[in-house]
Amino acid sequence: MKPAARRRARECAVQALYSWQLSHNDIADVEYQFLAEQDVKDVDVLYFRELLSGVATNSAYLDGLMKPYLSRQLEELGQVEKAVLRIALFELSKRDDVPYKVAINEAIELAKTFGAEDSHKFVNGVLDKAAPVIRPHKK
């Protein structure tokens, strides 16, 4: 699959996870509604689904990975930043096929696109500290 299709999958995953985090609806319902309402012709839909289910299933684990590196409480994080960090930490911890730098760079771009003005700096700071611990020998 083309890198652009993966990037679009991540963008869609941020939006769907944002909805899931706010609504607390079943992730399968969020996925179904998102795919029914959005144009996904240039999206790696399989990867989108994998990100959604992987993050939802592992959200407590992923939150535990980020907590030591947060400058504030997890509950104080913006929903966009939380979704972006969860995706990146899922890729770093569960997807060895995604290169270390790709996961971080994609997260920074997602934060620039969807986050508040300086959220990309916050995301970068958290991932710069967490990534070497998660993947100590795989840069």
Swiss-Prot record:
InterPro entries: NusB-like_sf, NusB_fam, NusB_RsmB_TIM44. One of its GO terms (cellular component) is cytosol. One of its GO terms (molecular function) is RNA binding. Pfam families: NusB. The keyword RNA-binding applies. Transmembrane segments: none annotated. GO terms for biological process: DNA-templated transcription termination; transcription antitermination. Belongs to the NusB family. Involved in transcription antitermination. Required for transcription of ribosomal RNA (rRNA) genes. Binds specifically to the boxA antiterminator sequence of the ribosomal RNA (rrn) operons. This is Transcription antitermination protein NusB. The gene is nusB.
